[in-house]
């Protein structure tokens, strides 16, 4: 944390302490002179899944529920929906929802590298028979400019977590 501002370092250290207090971290030490924080993630599978990207699925789900509640729109949704196609191909959809019982939207959440999976998502969108605006890849680390560029290049909608609600606003 030595390369961070004092304010940022304090915020990161406080956040790590909260993770430790809430047992997400099995260990956490802050070496003040060196300004180094060291933490060990809990070994519990649900904790590891959360930090492996499940947090973004929960983020997307909670944001979309709040979005539709504010607009008083009927929405049904699920996380980790397993879809089996007629040829018995199995796919898991991170977040899937229906608006007003009719409009399907699929959200795939990516916290790491996603570029090698774009073809997979293009095929999945086609098999689901939904419009590009309704197949959303919510990817951490994307700027609005990058998301717009990728959305223009592929028949998918790319958004950052910060741009997720704005995309929903365009759809609904």
PLM region descriptions:
Residues 1-172:
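Intrinsically disordered, low-complexity Ser/Thr/Pro/Gly-rich regulatory segments
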């Amino acid at each position: 944390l030595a390369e961070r501002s004092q304010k940022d370092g304090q915020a990161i250290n406080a956040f790590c302490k909260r993770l430790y207090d809430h047992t997400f971290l099995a260990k956490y030490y802050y070496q003040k002179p060196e300004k180094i924080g060291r933490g060990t993630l809990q070994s519990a599978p649900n904790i590891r899944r959360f930090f492996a990207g499940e947090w973004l699925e929960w983020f997307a789900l909670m944001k979309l529920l709040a979005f539709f509640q504010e607009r008083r729109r009927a929405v049904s949704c699920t996380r980790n929906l397993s879809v089996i196609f007629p040829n018995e191909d199995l796919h898991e959809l991170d977040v899937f929802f229906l608006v007003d019982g009719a409009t399907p939207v699929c959200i795939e959440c990516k916290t790491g590298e996603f570029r090698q999976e774009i073809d997979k998502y293009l095929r999945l969108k086609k098999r689901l028979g939904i419009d590009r605006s309704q197949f959303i890849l919510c990817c951490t680390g994307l700027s609005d400019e990058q998301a717009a560029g990728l959305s223009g290049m592929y028949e998918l909608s790319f958004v950052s977590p910060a741009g997720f609600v704005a995309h929903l606003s365009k759809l609904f």
